């Protein structure tokens, strides 16, 4: 063993007082504390070279246990959050009400407006109890053809103007 590792040089402590150099082991300490350990403002004799903390390892384990408990709680909270998000996504995606088939077919806007015009004309037309349905349908079909021809003529006239 080198003599230099047994001698702790003088240093200034935290309260700015100078501590004289000393040799390890000190009087009253165990014979196994042969090395000078610690920091520039706190030096002591220890049994392992390069040891920086004057505490026993059990102190560090108690800190680790507290850290592990904290990390465990944080992991449980994160897990609960992820499970909640998954459940809510499942409920959102798979519990939507099913679309009901109304039996109505999709139609273009022009066709809808033409049908509305026809239904208005049909409701305004007088109904005869003596006339059959086929006669009324023929009357409405003829009226539709006349209206379409009138629209075509109007479009042609506006194109030439």
From Swiss-Prot:
The gene is SHISAL2B. Pfam families: Shisa_N. Residues 115-134 are annotated as: Disordered. Keywords: Membrane, Transmembrane, Transmembrane helix. Its main location: membrane. It is a single-pass membrane protein. One of its GO terms (cellular component) is membrane. InterPro entries: Shisa, Shisa_N. It comes from the Eukaryota. Belongs to the shisa family. The chain crosses the membrane at residues 65-85. The lineage of its organism: Eukaryota, Metazoa, Chordata, Craniata, Vertebrata. This is Protein shisa-like-2B. It is found in: Membrane.
